[in-house]
Amino acid sequence: MPRKGNVPKREVLADPIHGSMVVAKLINSVMLDGKKGTAQNIVYGAFDIIKERAEENPVEVFEKAMNNIMPVLEVKARRVGGANYQVPIEVRPERRQTLGLRWLVKYTRARGEKGMIEKLAKEIMDAANNTGSSVKKKEDTHKMAEANKAFAHYRW
């Protein structure tokens, strides 16, 4: 926490081709070592593959995938009387999007296909069809929250 007041959030500019803020954030999540051009090539290449295979607008497929990945609930550790409890809490909309993108990129990198473009395209299509590792992560998070529902009264 900063001592001198709140630091204003920097706005992310919409991506130049699709005009979408979420796509711009995906590009920033994929980016490594400040190589934005490479990240854009990966994302736009994956969108081309999605357009080819799904024969739909790739941005709509991506947004559908994001809706399937974004968690509604998560658990947060809370110490009460010497014991740690996993307390289920609702996820703020901004954090939902951030977690969704983070999980999408993490499980994309863990896939077995050759080339990041192919991996990203397949992970997005899997997520849009409610399958894939990133959707499983969301379901596991929700199961964890459901299992710890008894501790919901410890919310702060």
Swiss-Prot record:
HAMAP family for the chain: Ribosomal_uS7_B (MF_00480_B)
A GO molecular function held by the record: rRNA binding
The keyword Ribosomal protein belongs to this UniProt entry's keyword annotation: yes
Domain of life: Bacteria
UniProt keyword list: Ribonucleoprotein, Ribosomal protein, RNA-binding, rRNA-binding, tRNA-binding
Keyword Repressor: no
Protein name (Swiss-Prot/TrEMBL): Small ribosomal subunit protein uS7
Pfam families linked: Ribosomal_S7 (PF00177)
Protein family membership: Belongs to the universal ribosomal protein uS7 family.
Gene Ontology CC terms, in alphabetical order: small ribosomal subunit
SUPFAM superfamilies per UniProt: Ribosomal protein S7 (SSF47973)
GO biological process: translation
InterPro entries according to UniProt: Ribosomal_uS7, Ribosomal_uS7_bac/org-type, Ribosomal_uS7_CS, Ribosomal_uS7_dom, Ribosomal_uS7_dom_sf
Function as written in the Swiss-Prot or TrEMBL entry: One of the primary rRNA binding proteins, it binds directly to 16S rRNA where it nucleates assembly of the head domain of the 30S subunit. Is located at the subunit interface close to the decoding center, probably blocks exit of the E-site tRNA.
